[in-house]
Structures are given as C-alpha cells and as structure tokens.
Amino acid sequence: VGSEMCIRDRYIDYLALHKLNYFHWHLTDDQAWRVEMKCRPELTEKGSIREGEIFGLYPGKYQPLPYGGYYTHEDVHEIVRYAAERHITVIPEMDIPGHCMAVLATYPQFSTTPNEPKKAALTWGIFNKFNNVLAPKPEVFDFLKDVFSELCDLFPGQYIHVGGDECAKRWWQ
C-alpha cells in the first residue's frame, strides 16, 4: 500500500500542477470492488478478489493466484484530504447497472439469472453474454441505498458517478 499511496499522491500532484480540480476515481467494475463497504462487508471480502490475473494483451498469460485488494475508509479519507489540500474534488465512480460481475459474484441473487454462478471477470471488455447487470429487484435497490449512503459519507463532494455504460437492455426483458 505504501508505494501505491506514493503513486496516488504523485497522480494528484500532477492534477494540481495542471490546474485540474476533479479526480474521477473508478472504484468498481467487472473485475473487482475496490472500496471498503462496512454496510456490506461480504462485498469487500469477496468482491475485491478475483481468482487470478491475466498479463499482457488478450489472450495474455494467465497467472492463477488470487489477486485483489481494496481501499479502506481510512485510505479514502486520506486521499480525499490530500486532494482537497490541492483544491481537487474526488468524484467516486460505482459502475452500475452494468459492469457488475464483482457485485454479482458476491450477490448472485441480484442478477437477472440468479441460478447461474458468477465470478469477477479476469479480462476487460463488455460481458453481455455473461449478464453482468443488476436486476431491477427490491433487494437490489436496498443494496444501492446502503452503498450510496456509505459513499456519500466517505466523499464530501456533491457528485457520485454511476457509470451507466455498456448495459445490455436485453437482460431486463
């Protein structure tokens, strides 16, 4: 984490150097959920880890070692503070309703195909054939309320980005 924080600090310093005042932080995707959720600890425990890593361009070289990690609340507070000292607002992104394989690996019942096993993706891209979208179900909306409430407590800015891209509507039909 130490070297990662150093890289992060440098990145924020570069934003400040170039007079950029927003840091859009992409914290979730098909591959992992990268921020601690105390309201949903199983999401952090399971959704932040994938079964391996692929190096290089697709198809790349597969390394079957668990890969993952996440930012704790303390990490987030430190990043937000560091950025604010440089007049930068951090905008977190929680990619929904698509790009949710890491969420669905933790909560398969949130899927439109809940009986099919899900796991966090190893590669990048659009996974329409795997149905990586959240279903419009009451328990999904409860989940979103929990997660957005916690994100609002963590990030003092006025925006949270929800992604919304590459979501195959056919899964909702």
Question: Where on the chain are the PLM-derived regions?
Answer:
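Catalytic domains of carbohydrate-active enzymes, especially glycoside hydrolases
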Residues: 10-30
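Aromatic- and acidic-residue-enriched carbohydrate-binding clefts of CAZyme catalytic domains
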Residues: 31-85, 100-139, 170-173
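Active-site beta-loop-alpha junctions enriched in small/polar residues
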Residues: 1, 28-32, 95-99, 165-167
